[in-house]
Amino acid sequence: MRSGGIDRIPPTLKTTLSDENSFRFDKGTTMMTKPSGLRLAAAMMLAIGLAGCGGGGDSPGAGAVASKQEMTVASTAKAASAPSTVGKLQRYQIDPAKVFVAGISSGGFAAVQMHVAHSSTFKGAAVYAGGVYWCAGVGGALSALANCGGLTLSTNQASYNSMLMESEAYLDTQSSLRTIDPVANLRGQPVYLWSGTQDEVVNPLEMADLNSEYQHYGARVHFDNAFPAEHGWESPDGELACGTLGSPYMVRCSANGAVYDSVKTWLTMFLGPLKPRNNGKLSGTLASFDQTEFGASPNLSMSSTGSVFVPRSCAQGDKCGLVLALHGCLQEASLIGNRWVTEAGINEWADTNKLVVVYPDTIASSAPGPTNPNACFDWWGYSNQYDPNYALKSGLQMSVLYAMVQRVTGRP
């Protein structure tokens, strides 16, 4: 454990947060609004989703994505046909050395939780605009808001209070208690980190701390932190320019005059040289599966269905890898359709490189259920009102996600 520190929630912030029902997402625009003073911006709305906290605030409706909700994006046209019927998630011949997790924003925080807690299963992680393990600590949503980039200052930069020291202390303790897998598993594992220099939602310092944390435990890290990107998942199929903030939070960036492909970068780290990306019609199948058999329920702010992409070769019995892909807040299927699944740019590589991709899905929820109006994955303990074990193997939502991995891999 290294030295570090935490600034507890200041009285002024507590005062600001006292009328939690005053926080609302502007459903008439895809972009953030900018109130005076401390700007209650996208980190609150996206990475944490506190709108209406404690009082059943409205979850964003279809208007939040404006007319783009009706667009037919290019990636959708070339992807495997969209899922129409709900089936049962199947087991495939998965190579245990090729099981990975990836996520953006709330899904990035959740990906770190899954990777750290189940490091004997996951052999690598790709994290976009997430943060250190157990970043929210025991303080729930308010702690997440104060310490993990939840408020944006007048300088348009997310505020930040480091949780690195507390994170590593908790991680070490839980590893010794065996509530998570041994931390020694992280040594040598490939980890990809993405942080845009223009990110107003998750402070780049949070991702710098995550880089330090993974380095501390001996992971092999590639840190992409030089692109002038706003908050979002980067891929050639992203419909937003690199520096644009807005729904569906899927951006495309360029490097040396060419379109960049962050997914190619981390898949190469994980798998070695790749077969070419399929930019045409995919041979694999995109299908919906029943999440409820794994314990998904409105009480965990989880949808009844998720999506899975299965390359034809994997369906025919070839040995394949697995990617568990976790979306961010305001990227749930009920809000943006299949744009996360088709614009992430994973399926195109998975199709030619034998990777099954599982896309769990969340739903927005509010009191009397979990306060999660922006359909974030649980990285502060909202499940079942409050889950103190949210970052452990026994965490309620973590258990659901891992059960999906167990089904696909056949791992006990």
Question: Model-predicted segments: where are they?
Answer:
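N-terminal cap/lid segment of alpha/beta-hydrolase-fold proteins
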Residues: 153-174, 273-317
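Bacterial signal peptide processing site
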Residues: 54-57
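Cap/lid segment of the alpha/beta-hydrolase catalytic domain
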Residues: 89, 138-151, 239, 243-246, ...
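The feature captures the conserved acid-bearing segment of alpha/beta-hydrolase catalytic domains
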Residues: 135-218, 266, 310, 315-316, ...
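C-terminal motif of bacterial Sec signal peptides marking the signal peptidase cleavage site
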Residues: 49-52
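Alpha/beta-hydrolase active-site loop
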Residues: 77-93, 167, 171, 178, ...
